[in-house]
Regions:
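A short, basic N-terminal segment
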Residues: 1-42, 273-275
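Conserved NTP-binding/hydrolysis module of P-loop NTPases
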Residues: 11-13, 71-72, 82-101
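Walker A/P-loop nucleotide-binding motif
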Residues: 41-63, 80
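Short regulatory helix/loop adjacent to the ATP-binding pocket of P-loop NTPases
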Residues: 64-67, 167-183, 192
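Conserved AAA+ ATPase "SRH/arginine-finger" region at the nucleotide-binding site
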Residues: 77-81, 171-174, 185-198
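Mid-core helix/loop region of P-loop NTP-binding domains shared across ATPases and GTPases
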Residues: 83-84, 99-142, 151-157, 193-198, ...
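Conserved AAA+ ATPase "sensor/coupling" helix adjacent to the nucleotide-binding pocket
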Residues: 93-96, 165, 174, 193-212
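C-terminal alpha-helical "lid" subdomain
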Residues: 179, 208-275
């Protein structure tokens, strides 16, 4: 509705990750640098953590656009609570392998054969595991064991782990993950956006959908928006969606700070809080 009222080509603040809307904040720029370094090493584990809605999935979607898919094969896993055997099966399926499950040895053999074939064809292999905080210790250990596969002295698999802050804590302090910890070659925790990044972030997304100055945005909004959302991108998107909707319903050409305050108050008391 509001996108039609304001003449946008699409919704600028949708919650699903879209690399077309990628905004390089200070913390995301650092994360990309660590990812680039880690991928150039071609081995071990890269770990990216951050709060819910901090932009981990959008970062990875942006990264995938930059990867050379003729030289790098990527498998992706979004985890629920997997045990070790399930992790092996899901990893195999992420690479398109025809495995039936229930036979860990067969699944491992299929993965090893696949990795060797990719290497012989001049391709590296990356496994991306999202929501890593849901993995059991056993599943994480199985991922470490997969990193043992080699062709000569060259590792055949590299793994990117994405998780919430509790995964960062688990990895840092669990005695059972000492060996995995030693194989982490790059890590970064996504911080919230800084106050001065809120306006550029919002305008970046608006410009992407053809914003032409309508609606105008009161300059007092940015400080209040940062305070209300803590600089978390998903929270900003939620608030801005509701603010634009209010503006369209009331046929406003200017988004005022009192409108933002009304939206924040409403969201704090309904079933869709800023969280």
């Amino acid at each position: 509705m509001y996108e039609e009222f304001y003449g946008f080509s699409e919704r600028p603040f949708q919650l699903t990750p879209d690399p077309a809307f990628y905004f390089e904040s200070v913390t995301h720029k650092k994360a990309l640098s660590y990812l680039g370094y880690g991928l150039n090493q071609g081995e071990g584990f890269i770990v990216i953590t951050g709060e819910v809605g901090s932009g981990k999935s959008t970062l990875v979607a942006h990264l995938k656009q930059k990867l050379d898919d003729e030289r790098l094969t990527v498998g992706e896993v979004v985890t629920s609570a997997l045990d070790g055997e399930e992790m092996i099966h899901v990893a195999a399926r992420s690479f398109g392998l025809d495995v039936t499950g229930g036979d860990k040895a067969a699944d491992l053999a299929a993965i090893e054969l696949f990795l060797h074939e990719e290497a012989r064809n001049g391709r590296r292999t990356l496994l991306i595991v999202d929501e890593a905080q849901n993995l059991s210790i056993g599943a994480l250990e199985e991922l470490r064991m997969l990193s043992n596969f080699q062709l000569g002295s060259h590792p055949l698999l590299q793994t990117l782990l994405l998780g919430q802050p509790e995964f960062k804590q688990l990895l840092a302090h669990s005695d059972e993950l000492e060996q995995l910890r030693q194989r982490v070659i790059a890590a970064h925790h996504l911080e919230p956006m800084q106050p001065g990044e809120i306006e550029p972030y919002v305008m970046h997304r608006l410009n992407h959908v053809g914003w032409n100055g309508n609606p105008e945005i009161d300059s007092g909004i940015w400080v209040k928006l940062h305070k209300a959302t803590g600089g978390i991108p998903r929270k900003i998107n939620q608030v801005m969606t509701r603010l634009l909707l209010l503006g369209a319903v009331e046929e406003q050409a200017v988004l005022e700070t009192d409108m933002l305050e009304a939206v924040i108050e409403e969201m704090s008391g309904d079933a869709a809080p800023v969280e």
